[in-house]
Design a protein with these regions (language model features):
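N-terminal regulatory modules of eukaryotic gene-expression and nucleic-acid-associated proteins
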Residues: 2-3
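Metalloprotease/metallohydrolase-associated module, dominated by Zn2+-dependent proteases
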Residues: 7-72, 76, 105-200
Length: 200
């Protein structure tokens, strides 16, 4: 029997973003090719976070993330709870939650009217029907990838961009590229696994 191929989960998440942009008008402004998805460290009880990288023409002192020559405008970081605690539905909800923060201009900034401090509980009320619609339309292959139970692969930072570039410091790199990312293993524990659990 041929071994089961481990999914590239960060690639699958980008595919979800691209698919949602085609199927839901509310996400039509998204361009998955300009969004870098990575697995990262824990941040309190967060499932995931989004970081705006600013417009293409940015002030001096801000790092640039450029992958295969294409400048990234956002970074979505999937936190350990997304991999080890979440169900399939929660994983999809987290992805759509983070990209719902993106500005309609898709210019490397966040939507000023969709901050938690502005909307509070209304944010979830607006997002919930979008998640429900997309869950009904997600392709089987993406459902399978996000339901994976076992070891998957994910892009991770080998060297993580800081908030700013400061001269004279080793971490003050101006441009980050695919050279500063690697594809490594991550353990996924799915509460409602769609694939047979594997011991690793």
């Amino acid at each position: 029997m041929a071994p089961v191929r481990r999914p590239n989960i960060t690639r699958a998440v980008r595919a979800v973003i691209q698919d949602a942009s085609r199927k839901l008008p509310e996400f039509a402004h998204l361009k998955a090719s300009r969004i870098r998805v990575v697995a990262g460290e824990a941040r309190r009880a967060s499932w995931g976070t989004i970081r705006p990288l600013g417009p293409i023409e940015r002030p001096a002192g801000k790092p640039v993330v450029r992958v295969k020559g294409r400048q990234m405008l956002y970074v979505v970081t999937l936190r350990p709870r997304w991999f080890r605690v979440a169900s399939f539905d929660k994983r999809v909800e987290t992805i759509l939650h983070e990209v719902f923060h993106i500005s309609k201009r898709f210019d490397g900034t966040l939507h000023s009217g969709r901050r938690h401090s502005t909307l509070r509980a209304d944010f979830d009320r607006r997002l919930r029907p979008l998640v429900k619609r997309y869950l009904a339309a997600i392709p089987p292959e993406l459902r399978q990838a996000l339901s994976w139970h076992g070891t998957a692969l994910a892009r991770q930072w080998l060297e993580k961009p800081g908030p700013s570039v400061k001269r004279g410091r080793p971490a003050g790199r101006r441009v980050y590229s695919e050279k500063h990312l690697f594809l490594g293993p991550v353990q996924m524990i799915s509460r409602t696994a769609r694939t047979k659990p594997r011991l690793n």
